[in-house]
């Protein structure tokens, strides 16, 4: 600011413009699919979404077959429901590692990221719902001198 101000009216004219929030662009491959990876615990999911009837395929199987528990299927649908896009996209994903709960969380994270790649304007809704945040909680390692991560061996006073 090399100039000096004569009055407070000039203050607004001298303010430098702050850079706007980053703009996100639509990222789609040649087949019209958006791709993203999701992670949770030890599970890693690769997710592709494309406009369709709402069919979800996990490791080349129907979602009802792969995730038999209704809670896990509900977890996968959460980002689509929050974005009001349930039944509008076909989801194809491959998931490996971890257990079923971690895999469902990884697929949910991947669907959320793929939705933002397909429709960047949904980023605010999904971020507010916590779907774009990677859940960094993993199993605590076992320590030597202990039975498990924190549990000590049985202690006898006498």
From Swiss-Prot:
It comes from Rhodopseudomonas palustris (strain BisB5). Pfam families: Ribosomal_S9. Residues 1-20 have a biased composition (Polar residues). GO terms for cellular component: cytosolic small ribosomal subunit. Belongs to the universal ribosomal protein uS9 family. Residues 1-29 are annotated as: Disordered. The keyword Ribosomal protein applies. This is Small ribosomal subunit protein uS9. The gene is rpsI. InterPro entries: Ribosomal_Su5_D2-typ_SF, Ribosomal_uS9, Ribosomal_uS9_bac/plastid, Ribosomal_uS9_CS, Ribsml_uS5_D2-typ_fold_subgr.
């Amino acid at each position: 600011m090399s100039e000096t101000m004569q009055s407070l009216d000039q203050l607004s004219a001298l303010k430098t413009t702050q850079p706007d929030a980053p703009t996100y662009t639509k990222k789609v491959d040649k087949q019209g699919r958006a791709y993203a990876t999701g992670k949770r615990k030890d599970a890693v999911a690769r997710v592709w979404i494309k406009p369709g009837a709402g069919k979800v395929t996990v490791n080349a199987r129907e979602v009802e077959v792969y995730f038999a528990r209704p809670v896990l299927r509900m977890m996968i649908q959460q980002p689509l429901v929050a974005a009001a896009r349930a039944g509008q996209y076909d989801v194809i994903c491959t998931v490996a590692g971890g257990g079923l709960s971690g895999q469902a969380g990884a697929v949910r994270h991947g669907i959320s990221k793929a939705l933002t790649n397909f429709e960047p304007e949904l980023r605010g809704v999904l971020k507010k719902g916590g779907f774009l945040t990677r859940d960094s909680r993993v199993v605590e390692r076992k320590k030597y001198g202990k039975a498990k991560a924190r549990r000590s061996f049985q202690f006898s006073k006498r």
